[in-house]
């Protein structure tokens, strides 16, 4: 069954500026030519980046961002043909996960204030390999690839991005770079949640009842199609104006959260085998009473307490508090589920997938260096470097 994905909802206003960044407080690593072609020998590139955390005003277009290096034998350097914006980019611009992500980038500089800047945003990339490490075996210069960029790495709103070969896949030939750039991050998140955490696949999803909260977003819309292709029964919560979208993607039942108490509406339905929560907050407590009382019932949330806790409490206290929170929820399910096993899975990492999709729709894309403002809209913004 061919899968089609409507683009995720991302409201963002980019205030274009070419004001240069202040010098970074930490030294840059030694550089080498990015590839053998003389035209590619450069030390700086164009990119959208931030020099501090804040609102839209901190996002700037610069032509003086250091070109990423191939510093590991397994590295692959990609010339970006297209990228896109995700809600995570907006959160990271404001400092979400800053402490833990800084630790992941460089444990030795975790106490150095501002060492992560300039920080390039962007989690999706579709482009062409221009350079490879000495041990790379699956890719060669000229290969067309796509990838989801981990949040602790420099992003793809730039001319180049460097990843390990294990984070990259060959781009499906039937997709253009613009189409391909709309998929990797939300698709990887959905697959990680449903397959790795939820244990679902083509052979295990038939007749399973799945609830997706916030189902009109990027992860939700991809999950709907994947689950329907596998034969699951899918219920979605969303606003009334998104009902047509999710039904068009295959949702069996839709609950309008603007039409009354969501828990009350869901309480009249048959209980669920799996709940994928894209919202968090009070949704968690509501969801626990909606699971079937059997050992395989699972509640999966994409709203991890780890990053929020480390931001507010510091690395050590935040990590301990998050671990205690997850442990308590996992071993003490409420109400009639005391005799069952309900798993609370908090996804803080995402693994790449190369599922082939077709029939993509997009409504807005613009060149990397376009400084014109993008007004808030219900689209996924696609950025082309071509």
What kind of feature is each model-predicted range?
Residues 26-45:
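N-terminal mitochondrial targeting presequences
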Residues 8-10, 26, 35, 352, ...:
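Cysteine-centered motifs
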Residues 12-15, 22, 34, 379, ...:
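Acidic, Ala/Val/Gly-enriched low-complexity intrinsically disordered segments
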Residues 11-13, 29, 38, 367:
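General secretory precursor processing signal
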Residues 1-27:
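N-terminal chloroplast transit peptides
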Residues 3-5, 39-72, 79-132, 137-386:
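Terminal helix/beta-alpha structural elements that buttress the NAD(P)+-binding lobe
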């Amino acid at each position: 069954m061919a899968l089609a994905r409507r683009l995720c909802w991302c409201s963002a206003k980019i205030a274009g500026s070419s004001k240069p960044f202040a010098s970074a407080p930490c030294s840059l690593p030694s550089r080498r030519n990015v590839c053998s072609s003389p035209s590619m020998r450069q030390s700086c590139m164009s990119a959208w980046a931030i020099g501090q955390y804040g609102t839209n005003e901190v996002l700037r277009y610069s032509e003086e961002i250091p070109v990423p290096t191939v510093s590991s034998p397994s590295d692959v350097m990609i010339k970006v043909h297209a990228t896109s914006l995700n809600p995570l980019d907006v959160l990271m611009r404001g400092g979400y996960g800053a402490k833990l992500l800084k630790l992941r980038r460089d444990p030795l500089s975790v106490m150095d204030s501002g060492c992560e800047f300039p920080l390039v945003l962007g989690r999706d990339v579709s482009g062409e390999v221009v350079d490879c490490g000495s041990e790379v075996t699956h890719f060669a210069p000229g290969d067309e690839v796509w990838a989801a960029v981990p949040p602790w790495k420099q992003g793809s709103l730039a001319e180049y991005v460097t990843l390990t070969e294990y984070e990259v896949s060959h781009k499906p030939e039937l997709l253009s770079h613009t189409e391909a750039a709309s998929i990797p991050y939300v698709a990887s998140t959905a697959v990680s949640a449903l397959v790795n955490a939820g244990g679902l696949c083509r052979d295990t999803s038939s007749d399973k009842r799945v609830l997706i909260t916030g189902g009109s977003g990027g992860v939700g819309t991809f999950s709907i199609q994947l689950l329907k292709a596998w034969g699951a029964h899918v219920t979605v919560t969303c606003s009334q104006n998104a009902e047509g979208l999710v039904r068009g993607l295959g949702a069996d039942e839709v609950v309008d959260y603007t039409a009354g108490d969501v828990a009350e509406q869901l309480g009249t339905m048959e209980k669920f085998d799996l709940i994928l929560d894209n919202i968090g907050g009070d949704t968690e407590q509501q969801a626990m009473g909606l699971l079937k009382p059997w050992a395989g019932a699972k509640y999966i949330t994409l709203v991890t307490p780890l990053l929020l806790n480390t931001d507010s409490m510091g690395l050590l206290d935040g990590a301990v508090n998050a671990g205690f929170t997850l442990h308590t929820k996992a071993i003490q399910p409420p109400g009639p589920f005391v005799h069952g096993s309900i798993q609370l899975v908090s996804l803080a990492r995402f693994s790449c997938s190369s599922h082939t999709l077709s029939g993509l729709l997009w409504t807005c894309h613009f060149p990397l260096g376009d400084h014109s403002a993008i007004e808030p809209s219900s689209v996924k913004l696609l950025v082309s470097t071509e």
